[in-house]
Amino acid sequence: MRKKLQVYISSTYADLVEERHAAVEAVLEAGHIPAGVGLFFKETQMGIIKRSIDESDVYILILGGFYGLTLRDDESKSYTHWEYDYAGEVGKPRFAFVVTDEALEQKPYDFELGGYYQKLQEFKRSVLEEIPTFYVEDVQHIQLVIHDQLQEYAGRDDLCGWFSGKDVPEVQKLWEENASLLRENAKLNAELEENKKTSE
């Protein structure tokens, strides 16, 4: 039976379009399920983000040159940073990519002029200290690492993943047994009610 992992991909938006796309592609090519609200929304509700991380098996962070959009109720922390912290709090296996300075220089942004540059550097340092982190210069490197890492994670028994119904043949049998037990239970309840009435 083949287990598909749900993989939450977190990154800033504008500076990492290609890297994020490459990560999604690598997850799909490895036969798993990419997730991440940034795949659909630039800004979204915390409840949706939490649910998406909770339902995921693995969390991937990609750090580029921007710290990211800050939270509405706490401007000292970006959504990306908050997602990273939350995934850690709920015990998700995490790994990260840091795009090298050389690769960032090829992008049409002056990252040091952007706001929160120092916060980004502090965030990078904490990520490097806490979880497996890979420096990457191109999208091919991201894809290779994701293939290797997900192969390792797929073998872990503590990660539930997703299974296709057709890969779980006993499910149909369980449905039938459950329906039979429900019918039997209803019949016994009816008999019990009848016995109560006759004994009164």
Describe every region a protein language model picked out:
Residues 1-62, 90, 172-200:
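Conserved N-terminal substructure of TIR/SEFIR domains
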Residues 14, 42, 66-68, 101-104, ...:
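Solvent-exposed loop/turn segments at secondary-structure junctions
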Residues 18, 69-71, 105-107:
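Extracytoplasmic/secreted cell-surface and envelope-processing proteins
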Residues 34, 94, 133:
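Hydrophobic anchor at the start of a short beta-strand
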Residues 40-45, 66-90:
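Conserved TIR/SEFIR loop-to-helix hotspot centered on a Trp-containing motif
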Residues 89-102:
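A short helix->loop->beta-strand "cap" motif at the edges of active sites that frequently abuts
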